[in-house]
């Protein structure tokens, strides 16, 4: 394998050696470089032997350094080889429920421990072998995010449809004993891995604390494109409340024993159960934001805190914004409070029902431009439509259905403004403009 250089830091030791864009690093101390983690680990030394492919052939250097630290290379990609693809056929897999005709990259299922560390992806470990666990421990690649779902080996085999699903659970204690911090995800399927099975899973994982540093439970998503024979019944208010009660019971016990809760239901459970989102202190360090744990509480706290500050407002401002069904009540509440404190700013909220995926998916991050167009055309009250950044892919201008923000703007005949994810940043964006200092209206 080889790591192709995209950029060399000016003045770095890599530049002194004459390395530049297009050159390929092959090995350090005869250790092959498969990814940026190998590079970081093996070059973090005062001396090493480097082998590279440059314009005139293979060159080698004995590098002597005064101190450890970054060597100075940035690469075209974090991985020198291919992403490790998923070998499971999980009964709850959302990618298997995507509609046909979407971009090819969306159908790729990765299960790569390197992306877990680099980007926070969750892995099941079913395609990992002992030497890869040894590498994680040796390089102290920590934390690792693991999709556990259940600690019952037989049930995990069934849920992942992979005969190694139960066997690889042995890697959890090995990682923990090796000093690797672990964040755990539980995708719960009604009547399958909740109830007593959830209690068993939480009990087993608590035995691995404090290196298991967080455990989040999220409900299985169900779309109209499920082709697998696994029947999934969506959670209702009663069954969602049962999950919350179990998670909070174990979280309370963990807090008594270890001083930290670490066990969190995602926001969706509270919304389904009709219960209020817990206060900010419940979420401690917000370790599981990417799983939708505490996201609404943090958003509201930041949004309201920003409204406490004076802002410059240029005259009056009208704007439309879109959101998903799950966040809709909170967004309506925040926009009403914004208007109460700053009457010159009026925001109309449009709740988008996710018909693209079949109506059972309520999160804002899965709203498509197709649904926005169908449900907002002719109904907008202003010349600007605010779109949450979470609805867009990594390119930051394209929805899941491959429609760009420019295309959306052209279709609706308005300017499209991408709104930041954090509550504070969004409040500032909505208030941006002004000829004078607008003092918020007090109660």
Positions of the model-derived regions?
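Conserved PDZ fold ligand-binding element
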Residues: 14-34
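Short, structured beta-strand/loop micro-motifs enriched in basic residues and often containing a Trp
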Residues: 2-10, 30-33
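PDZ domains, with a preference for the canonical peptide-binding region formed by the helix
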Residues: 27-51
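Flexible glycine/acidic-rich beta-alpha junction loops that bind and position SAM and/or redox cofactors
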Residues: 191-192, 212-239, 258-281, 353-360, ...
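Structural preference for beta-strand elements that scaffold enzyme active sites
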Residues: 143-145, 181-183, 214-216, 262-264, ...
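Conserved Radical SAM active-site core
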Residues: 58, 65-211, 221-250
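Radical SAM enzyme core and accessory elements
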Residues: 4, 274-443
């Amino acid at each position: 394998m080889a790591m192709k250089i995209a950029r060399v830091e000016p003045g770095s030791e890599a530049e002194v050696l004459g390395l530049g864009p297009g050159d390929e690093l092959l090995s350090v101390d005869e250790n092959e470089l498969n990814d940026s983690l190998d590079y970081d680990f093996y070059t973090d030394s005062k001396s090493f032997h480097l082998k590279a492919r440059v314009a005139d052939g293979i060159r080698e250097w004995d590098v002597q350094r005064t101190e450890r630290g970054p060597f100075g290379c940035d690469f075209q990609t974090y991985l020198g080889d291919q992403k490790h693809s998923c070998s499971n056929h999980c009964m709850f897999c959302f990618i298997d429920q995507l509609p046909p005709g979407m971009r090819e990259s969306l159908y790729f299922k990765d299960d790569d421990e390197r992306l877990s560390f680099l980007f926070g992806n969750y892995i099941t470990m079913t395609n990992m072998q002992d030497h890869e666990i040894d590498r994680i421990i040796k390089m102290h690649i920590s934390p690792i995010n693991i999709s556990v779902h259940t600690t019952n080996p037989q049930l995990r085999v069934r849920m992942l449809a992979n005969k190694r699903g139960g066997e690889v659970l042995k890697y959890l204690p090995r990682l923990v004993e090796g000093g690797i911090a672990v964040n755990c995800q539980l995708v719960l399927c009604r009547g399958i891995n909740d109830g007593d099975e959830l209690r068993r899973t939480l009990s087993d994982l608590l035995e691995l604390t404090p290196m298991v540093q967080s455990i989040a439970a999220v409900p299985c998503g169900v779309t109209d494109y499920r082709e697998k024979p696994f029947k999934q019944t969506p959670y209702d208010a009663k069954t969602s409340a049962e999950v919350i009660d179990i998670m909070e019971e174990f979280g309370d016990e963990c807090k008594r024993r270890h001083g930290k809760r670490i066990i969190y239901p995602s926001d969706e459970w509270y919304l389904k159960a009709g219960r209020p989102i817990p206060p900010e202190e419940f979420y401690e360090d917000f370790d599981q934001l990417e799983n939708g744990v505490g996201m609404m509480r943090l958003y509201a706290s930041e949004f309201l805190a920003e409204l406490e500050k004076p802002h410059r407002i240029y005259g009056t401002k009208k704007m439309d914004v879109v959101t998903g069904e799950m966040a809709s009540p909170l967004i309506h509440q925040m926009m009403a409070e914004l208007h109460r404190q700053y009457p010159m700013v009026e925001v109309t909220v449009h709740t988008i029902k996710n018909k693209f995926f079949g109506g059972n998916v309520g999160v804002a991050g899965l709203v498509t431009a197709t649904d926005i167009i169908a449900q907002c055309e002719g109904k907008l009250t202003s010349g600007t439509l605010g779109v949450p950044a979470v609805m867009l892919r990594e390119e930051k201008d394209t929805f899941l259905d491959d429609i760009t923000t420019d295309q959306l703007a052209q279709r609706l005949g308005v300017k499209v403004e991408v709104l930041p994810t954090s509550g504070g940043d969004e409040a500032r964006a909505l208030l941006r403009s002004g000829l004078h200092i607008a003092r918020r209206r007090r109660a």
